[in-house]
């Protein structure tokens, strides 16, 4: 039995590797005109990721879109942070969903070298005040795994209160998040994050393996792929069926694959 399981795992890994090869060996060149350049975590190569200062720098660098990550606190506030805990990016520790906003505001963000800065974790409201419709906001709700209960409703409430729905798109790896948002408001602009699609079969990898069909994701506007996993044929197929595509995350303009794309998510929007 163990040998059978091992064989299946090896088969899946080999199949996934073959699928990724399409993107790795795709023709490369300078970025195509019309691509939406998105500052990943605000433009993380320009400052402390997901900080207000970083977002401002990303906008100043010409990013047409700013990407952020959000989590919900124990007192139902929405804060902007990539990780579910404070440990990596701040001077504090602890899970965000177990802390109040007041507790979170007691800690400072760290720079890329691990040194404390004067920057604080911002709230979603502060980010909306900063962007104010000057760029698109690409907002990622992280995979829930029992955390972030009620985050969809609270995010939607804040976006409506701040008249931000018109310039906000929400993305997630988690189908349950996307499905919940669509049920709350079918007019929301929603995008599906994924690592890639297995070659030759209707299976995608988004942290889990699941069946892919255009019918299942009919409410999705765009599929956002790991940059080495989207090849020409798949991109053309998705566009033919009415979807857009973005790729994440890389910082070298000359490595942009020469395939049909709608956007690039990068830590260095200033280089594009």
Feature names for model-found ranges:
Residues 2-272:
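Phosphate-group recognition and catalysis centered on beta-loop-alpha active-site segments
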């Amino acid at each position: 039995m163990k040998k059978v399981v091992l064989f299946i795992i090896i088969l899946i890994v080999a199949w996934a590797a073959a699928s990724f090869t399409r993107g790795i060996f795709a023709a490369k060149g300078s970025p195509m005109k019309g691509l939406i350049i998105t500052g990943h975590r605000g433009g993380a190569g320009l400052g402390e990721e997901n900080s207000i200062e970083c977002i401002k720098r990303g906008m100043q660098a010409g990013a047409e879109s700013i990407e952020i990550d959000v989590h919900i606190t124990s007192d139902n506030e929405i804060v902007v942070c990539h990780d579910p805990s404070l440990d990596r990016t701040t001077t504090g520790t602890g899970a965000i969903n177990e802390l109040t906003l007041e507790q979170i505001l007691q800690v400072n963000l760290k720079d890329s070298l691990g040194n404390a800065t004067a920057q604080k974790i911002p709230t979603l409201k502060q980010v909306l005040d900063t962007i104010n419709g000057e760029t698109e906001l690409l907002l990622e709700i992280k995979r829930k795994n029992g955390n972030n209960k009620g985050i969809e409703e609270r995010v939607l409430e804040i976006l409506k209160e701040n008249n931000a729905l018109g310039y906000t798109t929400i993305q997630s790896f988690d189908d349950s998040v996307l499905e919940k948002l669509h049920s709350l408001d079918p007019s929301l602009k929603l995008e599906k994050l994924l690592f890639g699609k297995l070659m030759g079969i209707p299976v995608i990898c988004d942290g889990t393996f699941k069946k892919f069909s255009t019918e299942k994701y009919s409410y999705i506007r765009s599929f956002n792929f790991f940059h080495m996993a989207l090849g020409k044929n798949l991109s053309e197929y998705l566009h033919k069926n009415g979807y857009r595509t973005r790729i994440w995350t890389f910082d070298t303009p000359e490595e942009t694959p020469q395939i049909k794309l709608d956007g690039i998510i990068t830590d260095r929007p200033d280089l594009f």
